[in-house]
C-alpha cells in the first residue's frame, strides 16, 4: 500500500517555526518544483496564515490562494479550517460559513481539513457539508489529546459521528506531539478495523516521537501522513519529508516520491529560512515539558514570548504548572487554536494576578457558558455558576443561536469602505469576509492594501548575519524591543555585540502611537489606580470620566495575546483620570484610570 504524503511547508511548517511569516514572494519561485513532486496535497492556506497576511505582511490572503493555484495546478491545495470559527476566534452564522467555503473553493482550494477545538462534531457539521456541496474534499478531524476523559472509545465515537455527517476522509491531528507510537498503532488499527475510511495522520515533532508515531501508524494501515521538507522540519514543526520517503523506499509502503527532487526544494528553503531568523523560537532539539504539561509546541513558543512581553519570563514554569489545572477546570478541552490561546492566557492571568480567576478572560467565560460547544468533561461548577450569574448554559449547537449575519456584515463593510475611501476588490465579498473574520486588522489592511509601510518590513537575507560590532561599547543585558507591533528579545554583551536575537510571540498590531506621552505617564488623579494586568492594546473604554461604578463592573477591555480581557473595578468608586483610549498600547502595570 503506497503511503500518500501531504507537505505542510507552505502553511503549518512556517507557522510552527517562525510565526507564520513566510511571504508569497518566497513561495512562488519554488512552486513549480513543489507541483512536480507528486504529493497527495500541499497545505498552503488557513490556520494562522490568513491572520498573519493581513496583520503583519500586508498581503491579501485571497490573492495568495489564487496565485498559488495558478503556480501549482497539478497538486491539490489544502487548508486548515476551524469549523464554525472558520479562521477567526468566534462562531459565525451558517450563512457566513457557507459563503466562506464557496469563495475558498472558487479561489482555488481543493481539500478542507475541518476541525473543532472542542472536538464537538456539531461545530464541524456546517463547514463539512458546505465543502461537499461545493465539490471539494471534506476531511473531518480528530484533535488528539489525552486526559481522564479521553479513551479509545472517544475517538471511535467521534470518527463515527464524522462519517454520519459526511466526510471524504478523516485526519488524526496530533498538534502537541503527544501521540505515542503504540497509541498511534492502536488508534489507527481500531479505526481501520471498524470503518471504511481514508485515514490521515498529522504529528508535530516537538517531543521527539513523531517519526516513530508515523511509522507505527503506517504499519497499522494509515493511508496518508503530513511531513515538511527537511529544511523546514523538526523542533516545533513536523517530521522531515525526505527521511520518511527514504525510510519507506523499497517497502510495500513506498511513497514513490523522488528524493532528488525533494533535496532541490530543501536547498531552496534552506536559504530562504535565513531571512526569517528573527522570528524563530529558541527550541533546538526536543522538549519533554510538553509531555508533562501537554502544551503544543507553538503554544510553548507563544507563552515564552508573551511572558517576556509581560516582563515575567522567569515565571514560565509556574504558568506551565497552571495550564493543566485550567484545562481541567474547562472540561479537559484539547489545546488547539483557539482553546490553546484561551487556556494559556487564563493561566498567565492566574499567575500574574496572584489569584486564580481574579480576572476571567471573555473567552474563558465563553467556554464555561457553553458558547464554544460541548466540552469533553464537565467544567468547574463553581466557575460556571460565577460566569453564568443565574443564566442557563448553552447546550445546543452554539451556531443555532446565531441569526444569519452575512447581509449585515456586507452592508457594514461597504459603508465603512465608502466612509474611508477604500476601493474594494473586484469580488468585494472576499474583502467582506476578511473584515468579518478580523474586524480591526481586516479594516486596517483594506485601508493600507497598497501601503507596505503600514506593515512589517520585508525581511532581508542579511538579517540572519552577525550584527557588526558597535563603535561605542554598550551595557550588557537582555532587552525587549518592539518594532511594528512585534516584540524582539535582544541580548547585548559587553562591547555591544548582539549575540542573540529571537522573536517573541506575535502581538496584535497596535494603532499608530499618538504623539503624546504613553499611558503610564498620563496623569491618573487621586484615588486607587486601575492598572493593566497584561501588556496589550486597549480594545474599548467602557467607563467615562466621573461615572460612578460598582465593584466588579467592567471598566475597559484589553486585547492581549489575541484575546479580550475585561478589566473590572476592584471596588466601588468614581472614575477619574482616564489615561487611555481605544487603540493605545499599554505595558504591564500602566495606570489606565483611577477610582476615587
Swiss-Prot record:
CDD domains: biotinyl_domain, DRE_TIM_PC_TC_5S. It is an enzyme of class 7 (translocase). Residues 3-263 form the Pyruvate carboxyltransferase domain. It comes from the Bacteria. Residues 503-526 are annotated as: Disordered. Its cofactor is biotin. Keywords: Biotin, Ion transport, Sodium, Sodium transport, Translocase, Transport. Residues 523-596 form the Biotinyl-binding domain. Its EC number is 7.2.4.2. The modification N6-biotinyllysine is found at residue 562. It catalyses: oxaloacetate + 2 Na(+)(in) + H(+) = pyruvate + 2 Na(+)(out) + CO2. It comes from Klebsiella pneumoniae. This is Oxaloacetate decarboxylase alpha chain.
Amino acid at each position: 500500500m503506497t503511503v500518500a504524503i501531504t507537505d505542510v511547508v507552505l502553511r503549518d511548517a512556517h507557522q510552527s517555526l517562525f510565526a507564520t511569516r513566510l511571504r508569497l514572494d518566497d513561495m512562488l519561485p519554488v512552486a513549480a518544483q513543489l507541483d512536480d513532486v507528486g504529493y497527495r496535497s500541499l497545505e498552503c492556506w488557513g490556520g494562522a496564515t490568513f491572520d498573519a497576511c493581513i496583520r503583519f505582511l500586508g498581503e491579501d490572503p485571497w490573492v495568495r490562494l489564487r496565485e498559488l493555484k495558478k503556480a501549482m495546478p497539478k497538486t491539490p491545495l489544502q487548508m486548515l479550517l476551524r469549523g464554525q470559527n472558520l479562521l477567526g476566534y468566534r462562531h459565525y452564522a451558517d450563512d457566513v460559513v457557507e459563503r466562506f467555503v464557496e469563495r475558498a473553493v472558487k479561489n482555488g482550494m481543493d481539500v478542507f481539513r475541518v476541525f473543532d477545538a472542542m472536538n464537538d462534531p456539531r461545530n464541524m457539521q456546517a463547514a463539512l457539508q458546505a465543502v461537499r456541496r461545493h465539490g471539494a474534499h471534506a476531511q473531518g478531524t480528530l484533535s488528539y489529546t489525552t486526559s481522564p476523559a479521553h479513551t479509545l472509545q472517544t475517538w471511535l465515537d467521534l470518527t463515527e459521528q464524522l462519517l454520519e455527517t459526511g466526510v471524504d476522509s478523516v485526519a488524526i491531528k496530533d498538534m502537541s506531539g503527544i501521540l505515542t507510537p503504540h497509541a498511534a498503532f492502536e488508534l489507527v488499527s481500531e479505526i481501520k478495523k471498524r470503518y471504511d475510511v481514508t485515514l490521515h495522520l498529522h504529528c508535530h515533532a516537538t517531543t521527539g516521537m513523531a517519526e516513530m508515531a508515523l511509522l507505527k501508524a503506517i504499519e497499522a494501515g494509515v493511508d496518508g501522513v503530513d511531513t515538511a521538507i527537511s529544511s523546514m522540519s523538526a523542533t516545533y514543526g513536523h517530521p522531515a519529508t525526505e527521511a520518511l520517503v527514504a525510510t519507506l523506499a523499497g517497502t510495500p509502503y513506498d511513497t514513490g516520491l523522488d528524493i532528488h527532487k525533494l533535496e532541490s526544494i530543501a536547498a531552496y528553503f534552506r536559504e530562504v529560512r535565513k531571512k526569517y531568523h528573527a522570528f524563530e523560537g529558541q527550541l533546538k532539539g526536543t522538549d519533554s515539558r510538553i509531555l508533562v504539561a501537554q502544551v503544543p509546541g507553538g503554544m510553548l513558543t507563544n507563552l515564552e514570548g508573551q511572558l517576556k512581553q509581560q516582563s515575567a519570563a522567569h515565571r514560565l514554569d509556574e504558568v506551565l504548572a497552571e495550564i493543566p489545572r485550567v484545562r481541567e477546570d474547562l472540561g479537559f478541552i484539547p489545546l488547539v487554536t483557539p482553546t490553546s490561546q484561551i487556556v494559556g492566557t487564563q493561566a498567565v492571568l492566574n499567575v500574574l494576578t496572584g489569584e486564580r480567576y481574579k480576572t476571567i478572560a471573555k473567552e474563558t467565560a465563553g467556554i464555561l457558558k457553553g458558547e464554544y460547544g460541548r466540552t469533553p468533561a464537565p467544567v468547574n461548577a463553581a466557575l460556571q455558576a460565577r460566569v453564568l450569574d443565574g443564566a442557563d448554559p448553552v447546550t445546543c449547537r452554539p451556531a443555532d443561536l446565531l441569526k444569519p449575519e452575512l447581509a449585515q456584515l456586507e452592508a457594514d463593510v461597504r459603508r465603512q469602505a465608502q466612509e474611508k475611501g477604500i476601493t474594494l476588490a473586484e469580488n468585494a465579498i472576499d474583502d467582506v469576509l476578511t473584515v468579518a473574520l478580523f474586524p480591526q486588522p481586516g479594516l486596517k489592511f483594506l485601508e493600507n492594501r497598497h501601503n507596505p509601510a503600514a506593515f512589517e518590513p520585508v525581511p532581508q537575507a542579511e538579517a540572519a548575519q552577525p550584527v557588526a560590532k558597535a563603535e561605542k561599547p554598550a551595557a550588557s543585558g537582555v532587552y525587549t524591543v518592539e518594532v511594528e507591533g512585534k516584540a524582539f528579545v535582544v541580548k547585548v554583551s559587553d562591547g555591544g555585540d548582539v549575540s542573540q536575537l529571537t522573536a517573541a510571540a506575535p502581538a496584535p498590531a497596535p494603532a499608530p502611537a499618538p504623539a503624546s506621552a504613553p499611558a503610564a505617564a498620563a496623569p491618573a488623579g487621586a484615588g486607587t489606580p486601575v492598572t493593566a494586568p497584561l501588556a496589550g492594546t486597549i480594545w474599548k473604554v467602557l467607563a467615562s470620566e466621573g461615572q460612578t461604578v460598582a465593584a466588579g463592573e467592567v471598566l475597559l477591555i484589553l486585547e492581549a495575546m489575541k484575546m479580550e480581557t475585561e478589566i473590572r473595578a476592584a471596588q466601588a468608586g468614581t472614575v477619574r483620570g482616564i489615561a487611555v483610549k481605544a487603540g493605545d498600547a499599554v505595558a504591564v502595570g500602566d495606570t489606565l484610570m483611577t477610582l476615587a
